[in-house]
Swiss-Prot record:
Gene that this sequence comes from: ATP5MF
Keywords, ordered alphabetically: Acetylation, ATP synthesis, CF(0), Hydrogen ion transport, Ion transport, Membrane, Mitochondrion, Mitochondrion inner membrane, Phosphoprotein, Transmembrane, Transmembrane helix, Transport
PANTHER family, per database record: ATP SYNTHASE F CHAIN, MITOCHONDRIAL-RELATED (PTHR13080), ATP SYNTHASE SUBUNIT F, MITOCHONDRIAL (PTHR13080:SF16)
Modified residues (N-acetylalanine): 2
Any one GO CC term of the record: mitochondrion
Name the record gives this protein: ATP synthase F(0) complex subunit f, mitochondrial
Primary location group: mitochondrion
Origin species: Bos taurus (Bovine)
Modified residues (N6-acetyllysine): 16
Length: 88
């Protein structure tokens, strides 16, 4: 017999589509809950890619690539106008 896991303790990928709205409403949306979620995500990323025995540059290069991409998205409006000019 399979053990029954409460809906609040299920991970997002384990939730059925019909249970999704009630699962979302059970999440903690207080500032401390949101900060805790970001902290868990940071520690998960850090332990998976940075804090390993045989480390490589992959973890740090992903952070750098995300930084470059987000800055490009932020300044796209100005870059688009520069590209459309005929004379610089």
């Amino acid at each position: 017999m399979a053990s029954v896991v409460p809906l609040k303790e299920k991970k997002l990928l384990e939730v059925k589509l019909g249970e999704l709205p009630s699962w979302i409403l059970m999440r903690d949306f207080t500032p401390s809950g949101i900060a805790g979620a970001f902290q868990r995500g940071y520690y998960r990323y850090y332990n998976k890619y940075v804090n390993v025995k045989k480390g490589s540059i992959a973890g740090l290069s992903m952070v750098l690539a995300a930084y470059v991409f987000l800055n490009y998205c932020r300044s796209y409006k100005e870059l688009k106008h520069e590209r459309l000019r005929k004379y610089h």
